[in-house]
């Protein structure tokens, strides 16, 4: 059975340590915790090294997920005091599971407040793709998929919720919940 690989990317208005990011930085561990307890969650990229950076992922080793990378359209800083990118990479049992997580509870609260923290980018900021069960996507894969969907639009290689594809590459209509709810 295939799994859905899912990556997100955004750019903060200010580097991580800026006081305007305090509410985002406080929310981040709650958002990650909620993902890990969501139905359909399989795994997410977490660093395995002991590098003592507070904010940046650049230079970090994520084990089988690979060394951290950002898509080529990111031109921001790469040090703790200059890094402005926010990115995730995760695996899910199916597309409905990641959609349900993304548009409910604490993550929906974060989405609704994204303009407070993030700059508007002309690029696609998330991508999904299917991987065989047991395959772990890498940060390099994530960057390639983000760049691909940005250049070519949704295809079986990289797609979004609006134009999804099943594991066989056929167009797929996402079965969405009736009404997302936010508890925050």
Each language-model region and where it sits:
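Short S/T/G/P-rich N-terminal loop/turn motif that feeds into the first structured element of a domain
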Residues: 1-85, 97-100, 124-184
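Generic macromolecular interface patches on structured domains
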Residues: 41, 98, 108, 117-120
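Tryptophan-centric aromatic hotspots in well-structured domains and transmembrane helices
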Residues: 91-92, 117
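Beta-hairpin (beta-strand-turn-beta-strand) motif
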Residues: 93-95, 104
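"Short basic amphipathic alpha-helical interaction patches in structured regions
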Residues: 101-113
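Aromatic sugar-binding interfaces of carbohydrate-active proteins
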Residues: 112-128
């Amino acid at each position: 059975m295939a799994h859905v690989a899912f990556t997100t990317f955004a750019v903060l208005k200010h580097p991580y340590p800026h006081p305007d990011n305090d509410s985002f930085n406080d929310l981040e561990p709650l958002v990650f915790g909620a993902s890990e307890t969501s139905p359909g969650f399989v795994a997410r990229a977490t660093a395995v090294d002991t590098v003592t950076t507070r904010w940046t992922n650049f230079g970090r080793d994520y084990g089988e997920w690979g060394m951290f990378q950002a898509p080529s359209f990111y031109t921001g800083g790469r040090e703790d005091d200059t890094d402005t990118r926010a990115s995730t990479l995760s695996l899910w049992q199916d597309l409905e599971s990641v959609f349900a997580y993304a548009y409910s509870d604490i993550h929906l609260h974060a989405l609704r407040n994204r303009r407070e923290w993030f700059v508007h980018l002309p690029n696609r900021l998330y991508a999904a793709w299917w991987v065989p069960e047991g395959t772990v996507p890498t940060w390099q894969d994530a960057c390639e998929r983000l760049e691909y969907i940005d250049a070519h639009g949704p295809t079986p290689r990289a797609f979004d919720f609006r134009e999804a594809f099943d594991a066989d590459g056929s167009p797929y209509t996402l079965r969405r919940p009736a009404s997302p709810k936010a508890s925050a």
